[in-house]
Regions:
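Structured, basic alpha/beta domains of bacterial-type, RNA-associated proteins
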Residues: 59-79
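Helix-rich terminal scaffold detector
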Residues: 1-63, 158
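Non-DNA-binding regulatory cores of transcription-related proteins
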Residues: 75-158
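Flexible, active-site-adjacent loop/turn segments at secondary-structure boundaries
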Residues: 2-4, 40, 72, 86, ...
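Acidic side chains
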Residues: 17, 41, 49, 53, ...
Length: 158
């Protein structure tokens, strides 16, 4: 199985979700199924059906997270020393060359990506354009509105 890069923070979030699923959600679902069974006829028992559906979701999510964590290559950006080069986990300050607008992104794994928080997926067009570049370089990105050029103002490993 191929390794999946994930930041330390992303791995901690997945572990916290897994813990909640195993210690809160799973016991709740088991109890809900037990209570629904106690009501008698299961063939027309909506509570039982809903609890079984929830159980399927919870167990599926537990397996999914377990799989991701077992294949994860956890990277702590604060321990990186890439000499100003953009790598997975780095935080990059950019200036859009046409408008002068400044943005800051951290390059993260698929499960961590949230553009509103400035977290971009390693396989996104902007991350692919930035990887390997250094401070002062220009990255050209194919955006929905056309090509955009960004100057890399700073690269941080935080």
């Amino acid at each position: 199985m191929a390794t999946i890069p994930i930041t330390k923070r992303g791995a901690e979030k997945l572990k916290a979700e897994l813990h909640k699923l195993k210690t809160v959600e799973r016991p709740w679902v088991i109890n809900a199924i037990s209570e629904a069974r106690a009501q008698g006829d299961l063939s027309e028992n909506a509570e039982y059906d809903a609890a079984k559906d929830r159980q399927g979701f919870v167990e599926g999510r537990i397996q999914e997270i377990d799989g991701k964590l077992s294949a994860a290559q956890v990277i702590d950006p604060s321990e990186l020393d890439a000499g100003g080069r953009v790598v997975f986990g780095s935080t990059v300050e950019l200036e859009e060359e046409e408008t002068g607008e400044r943005v800051k992104y951290q390059i993260v794994g698929e499960d961590e990506a949230d553009l509103k928080l400035g977290l971009v997926n390693i396989s996104s067009p902007i991350a692919r354009a930035l990887i390997g570049k250094e401070e002062g370089d220009t990255a050209v990105v194919q955006a929905p509105g056309g090509l955009k050029s960004y100057e890399i103002v700073a690269v941080h490993y935080i």
